[in-house]
Amino acid sequence: MGGEDYYLELCERPVQFEKANPVNCVFFDEANKQVFAVRSGGATGVVVKGPDDRNPISFRMDDRGEVKCIKFSLENKILAVQRTAKAVDFCNFIPDNSQLEYTQECKTKNANILGFCWTSSTEIVFITDQGIEFYQVMPEKRSLKLLKSHNINVNWYTYCPESAVILLSTTVLENVLQPFHFRAGTMSKLPKFEIELPAAPKSTKLSLSERDIAMATIYGQLYILFLRHHSRTSNSTGAEVVLYHLPREGACKKMHILKLNRTGKFALNVVDNLVVVHHQDTETSVIFDIRLRGEFDGTVTFHHPVLPARSIQPYEIPLAGPAAVTSQSPVPCKLYSSSWIVFQPDIIISASQGYLWNLQVKLQPIVNLLPDKGRLMDFLLQRKECKAVVLSVCSQMLSESDRATLPVIATVFDKLNHEYKKYLDADQSYTMAVEAGQSRSNPPLKRPVRTQAVVDQSDVYTQVLSPFVENKEMPHKFVIAVLMEYIRSLNQFQIPVQHYLHELVIKTLVQHNLFYMLHQFLQYHVLSDSKPLACLLLSLESFYPPAHQLSLDMLKRLSTANDEIVEVLLSKHQVLAALRFIRGIGGHDNISARKFLDAARQTDDVMLFYTIFRFFEQRNQRLRGNPNFTPGEHCEEHVAFFKQVFGEQALMRPTTF
């Protein structure tokens, strides 16, 4: 399998820590994404490493028994360590605060602490087998204050730090889940819900395992992911992942079912809003995108893998230290190892090898694995880093080797412009709201974020259409059809078409002498009026004489003042066109000779300069009976230049009758 075929990879720079062994225990904190390596209960050192930490945190603590759980509060201000089932110990890591440990026992009598979660830099939740206790930690007083508690029988729990939701498993079958949400000193109880267990014979006792539940945010919404090893319907083989949507308000609802079509050991990650399911037996993974169209049965949507199953890209463990200098080759990493542990959303840890990786999606290989261009675009436009790949797909579908049909090209352009229009509308609404003084509204207005899915006209023009038009091998009819298809799509979404796209169409038509088509496009307003377009038409007069009149008509429709038209033409170095225009409206006796001679000089075309100079000499002769310029016209430098280039004898002599 070529390297271009893998669409999942482990990050290049993993967090490296001391491998787990009888002396060294390894813990992972899902909130701070930190790995703790605790040697000899902390007596010979604790090393804490996170993905963004340039400098690991190292410290020692007294060995007061086996460490069951160890985590820093957010911002690494307070360390919490659980050594017994009854209490949690705390130690301040704040400058000028006492570093003496202080302890908090759980309030409920006879309860055992299953674990704890920090929800902020000074708020912590104890989860016991009899409920939860929410505390505020006061580091300066070295004590805790109980904010709220709730009694409920708990089998196990899981925590989603991104949304600050704790899920408690209750009842004998362990499948009734009770969520709690934490925010700024408050604890809210959300409606409990039941996870449907697979159908099973009466003799077997099925219960919900903590291993088969994950919580993750997908497309901004919180979901509970349940790995159901056997489908509820007996005629269906293989496992499935059931997604329950957990809203901030209202009941949890089953929304999606991801069909795995295989059985065995699975693990789940969420990367870039994609659900990744790893299968240990085949050492492959598949990805699901719940935004892509699935099969809806009236209640839930069924999804199949977006792509064929593939292994994560082979990974070599980089050598460090003196060994890296020798000829020793890097060691291939054992992928899908039984020692791998996955954490949400995108973390894979190998405790036996001492590595923490972030899982990543590679978009470029997917282009060749998903032949349906419409579905490919739907998929790519939802990804964070999609712009370069989206533009490469557009270029590829216009290339000779992979040329797509016009309906497919139209579909792709429509999908791009749908996202583009969504952003333009949101941005306009925001601007109008700010201008109307609603910027201090509650909740405060947020400027829409321009994601990489917003591919605008300049992106398509620069990266796709310009190179495409320059390819001389392309049939010109196809080129024009593609350009018009993009303009059609922009018009359909009511996006004003930029003049440079119209210019590209006109230049292509002129290049292939398709003047009749150009005339039709202008006549039926397929190409929108604009000043740059009118100037371009004027410059085409020598190839296509009617272009002059078409241009003037356009400028008049735009209500452009005559002197402004002249300025526009001169700025575009269309000196002759400007002169023809001014003669056409009878204003040539009053124009500034110097302005036209300046413009002619700037073109570096001496014959053009000669023509313009001669025109004004003739005008002077006609109006004043003398070809020479008057001092008031300030043309001395141009007369000197004319003499220098053409000689004094080339100047007109006054005509006498």
From Swiss-Prot:
Pfam families: RMC1_C, RMC1_N. Transmembrane segments: none annotated. Keywords: Autophagy, Endosome, Lysosome, Membrane. Residues 471-637 form the Mic1 domain. Its main location: membrane. It is found in: Lysosome membrane; Late endosome membrane. GO terms for cellular component: late endosome membrane; lysosomal membrane; Mon1-Ccz1 complex. Highly expressed in heart, brain, spleen, lung, liver, skeletal muscle, kidney and testis. InterPro entries: RMC1, RMC1_C, RMC1_N, WD40/YVTN_repeat-like_dom_sf, WD40_repeat_dom_sf. Disulfide bonds: none annotated. GO terms for biological process: autophagy; regulation of autophagy. SUPFAM superfamilies: WD40 repeat-like. Found in a complex with RMC1, CCZ1, MON1A and MON1B. Component of the CCZ1-MON1 RAB7A guanine exchange factor (GEF). Acts as a positive regulator of CCZ1-MON1A/B function necessary for endosomal/autophagic flux and efficient RAB7A localization. Belongs to the RMC1 family. PANTHER family: COLON CANCER-ASSOCIATED PROTEIN MIC1, REGULATOR OF MON1-CCZ1 COMPLEX. This is Regulator of MON1-CCZ1 complex. The lineage of its organism: Eukaryota, Metazoa, Chordata, Craniata, Vertebrata.
